[in-house]
């Protein structure tokens, strides 16, 4: 099933944002009971709305095809059994092959994040592994079932550098990880200057 996305002039309560309306193919840019809305600011999706314009703020995510489709499925805009493709303006489809995402983009305070590998262009992703996060600390590294590895308890900073190190060391991912659906805390100098490599080494030494 094909949907099309058009720009809207209205921004509603989101000043400085660009509004997009999503309709079924050939329905045109008008507002109907099947319409859905996406609000974008600084090239990030900041909110979505249904046809009644009941809005939901989301943690800002890059305005990409994959992120748009994930939000659409999180909010049940489309039937999961249908192959949906959105054509339109605005989104950048250049995207890393690997991402780290909250279990649901709709969650404001996620605790479990999954590493995912994009299998092909249209929506398909493969679960690679995951991490648990509490109070901005990575507390556990999760392997897929049947992987033959035990999950590992760790105590690591929840930063982009360490996320990429975990992906490389534990899951053999040599691509940059795109963090989706969640804004990482700002990186601050720790009280004890422990390097990333030392943290990873200590985690390895404590593997059970």
UniProtKB/Swiss-Prot annotation:
GO terms for biological process: symbiont-mediated suppression of host innate immune response. Transmembrane segments: none annotated. Keywords: Host-virus interaction, Inhibition of host innate immune response by virus, Viral immunoevasion. Belongs to the Anti-DarT factor A family. Plays a role in counteracting the host DarT defense system. This is Anti-DarT factor A. The gene is adfA.
